[in-house]
């Protein structure tokens, strides 16, 4: 967790919870990083909250993968580690706000509700003029029944029920006390903990656009609610790398080790495939090349595994609000034969970048015994990366 930052005089902070695993959504990666109408789900909430005029700072609670894809954080924001449960994640964020006074206001919001806007925040802050806590709610439109063993029971009166959303607003001291006295109670939101103190929680009008992303089908619902079309441009980058073959070294190509009498010589593990892909992605971003970010003059990269370089390039795509559309890698070698390893290489590249294997193509060719590759002096690789980036 980063050190606490001193608050500004207005003392309004946000806690953005993005530490959930999202298993029910079934995306194969954190749902906060899924693409929604032109940018990752997490970015919808982060951009609105960080841009809110009355906000003095914030805490993003997220695991390493999500944090790396979101770097750099907005000015005034800090990072905190997630807990096993939501309640612990909020407690970790509160620890990052140690220097903030009890009369400060804190907004607690779930990143899985990307439709937050300034209007609902305005209503919440206004409600705190006469309360220690406020939450957005919507009426329940459906008929509700008790259900058990596959049978419908009595109808539940809905006129006294409401759907609770986030963000939720609290006086910081009240929320601190609620978490301190929670004693491990499992609460689904922070208002539940605050109510256990006997504190009245005000309600304000919610927003249908604060629909929660829980299942994969919710993506289509949110896309319709947010009413924004993808405004993306396609960028293409090319990469090329070559290394000399030397006897007695391990041979790494495309992130896997291949049994061979010779290996590639270089400052790192000399993986020509991953180096070419890294340069192709960085080229599409207009973000220099592998030597700019991992200079061979830097001893920390001596013997380094090249998957670190490719992973970095993928994180840079995400940090720029982009996504990898397709990668095409060609290995140029007389020996060893690459064909038997193509699937393993493809799958390893997809694993490193956390993208579907169908977005990766791996091919191999020779130079018909011509040139340095034909003489088995070295191996070359060339790559093309196609990525989508937000229009600027």
Curated annotation (Swiss-Prot):
Stated name of the protein: Bifunctional enzyme IspD/IspF
Could you say which residues are annotated as the site Transition state stabilizer? 24, 31, 267, 366
Q: Which InterPro entries match?
A: IspD, IspD/F, IspD/TarI, ISPD_synthase_CS, MECDP_synthase, MECDP_synthase_CS, MECDP_synthase_sf, Nucleotide-diphossugar_trans
What's the source species for this entry?
A: Sphingopyxis alaskensis (strain DSM 13593 / LMG 18877 / RB2256) (Sphingomonas alaskensis)
Keywords carried by this UniProt record: Isoprene biosynthesis, Lyase, Metal-binding, Multifunctional enzyme, Nucleotidyltransferase, Transferase
| Record site feature (Positions MEP for the nucleophilic attack), residues | 158, 212
Q: Name one GO molecular function term.
A: metal ion binding
Q: Where are the transmembrane segments?
A: none
Fetch the Pfam families from UniProt.
IspD, YgbB
Similarity section: In the N-terminal section; belongs to the IspD/TarI cytidylyltransferase family. IspD subfamily. In the C-terminal section; belongs to the IspF family.
Nucleotidyltransferase as UniProt keyword: yes
Where, in this chain's numbering, is a divalent metal cation bound?
241, 243, 275
Swiss-Prot/TrEMBL cofactor(s): a divalent metal cation
Q: What does this protein do?
A: Bifunctional enzyme that catalyzes the formation of 4-diphosphocytidyl-2-C-methyl-D-erythritol from CTP and 2-C-methyl-D-erythritol 4-phosphate (MEP) (IspD), and catalyzes the conversion of 4-diphosphocytidyl-2-C-methyl-D-erythritol 2-phosphate (CDP-ME2P) to 2-C-methyl-D-erythritol 2,4-cyclodiphosphate (ME-CPP) with a corresponding release of cytidine 5-monophosphate (CMP) (IspF).
């Amino acid at each position: 967790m980063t050190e606490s930052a001193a608050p500004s005089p207005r003392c309004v902070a946000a806690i953005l919870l993005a530490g959930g695993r999202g298993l029910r959504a079934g995306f194969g990666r954190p749902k906060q990083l899924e693409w929604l109408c032109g940018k990752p789900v997490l970015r919808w909430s982060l951009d609105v909250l960080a841009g809110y005029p009355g906000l003095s700072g914030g805490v993003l609670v997220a695991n390493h993968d999500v944090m790396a894809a979101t770097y750099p954080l907005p000015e005034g924001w800090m990072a905190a580690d997630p807990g096993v449960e939501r309640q612990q994640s909020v407690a970790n964020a509160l620890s990052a706000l140690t220097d903030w006074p009890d009369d400060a206001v804190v907004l607690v919001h779930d990143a899985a509700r990307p439709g937050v806007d300034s209007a609902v925040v305005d209503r919440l802050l206004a409600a705190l003029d006469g309360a220690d806590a406020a939450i957005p709610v919507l009426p329940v439109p459906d008929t509700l029944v008790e259900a058990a063993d596959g049978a419908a029971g009595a109808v539940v009166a809905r006129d006294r029920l409401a759907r609770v959303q986030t963000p939720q607003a609290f006086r910081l001291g009240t929320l601190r006390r609620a978490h301190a006295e929670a004693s491990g109670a499992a609460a689904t939101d922070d208002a539940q903990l605050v109510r256990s103190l006997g504190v009245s929680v005000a309600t304000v009008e919610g927003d249908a656009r604060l629909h929660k992303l829980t299942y994969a089908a919710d993506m289509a619902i949110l896309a319709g609610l947010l009413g924004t079309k993808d405004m993306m441009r396609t960028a293409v980058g090319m990469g090329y790398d070559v290394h000399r073959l030397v006897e007695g070294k391990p041979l790494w190509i495309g992130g896997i080790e291949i049994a061979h009498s010779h290996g590639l010589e270089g400052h790192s593990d000399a993986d020509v495939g991953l180096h070419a892909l890294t340069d192709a992605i960085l080229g599409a971003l207009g973000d220099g090349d592998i030597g700019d970010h991992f200079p061979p003059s830097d001893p920390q990269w001596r013997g380094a595994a090249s998957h670190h370089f490719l992973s970095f390039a993928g994180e840079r795509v995400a940090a720029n609000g982009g996504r990898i559309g397709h990668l095409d890698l060609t290995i140029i070698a007389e020996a060893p034969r690459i064909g038997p390893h193509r699937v393993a290489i493809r799958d390893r590249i997809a694993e490193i970048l956390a993208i579907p294997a169908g977005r990766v193509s791996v091919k191999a060719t020779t130079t018909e015994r011509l040139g340095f590759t034909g003489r088995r002096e070295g191996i070359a690789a060339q790559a093309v990366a196609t990525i989508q980036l937000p229009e600027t």
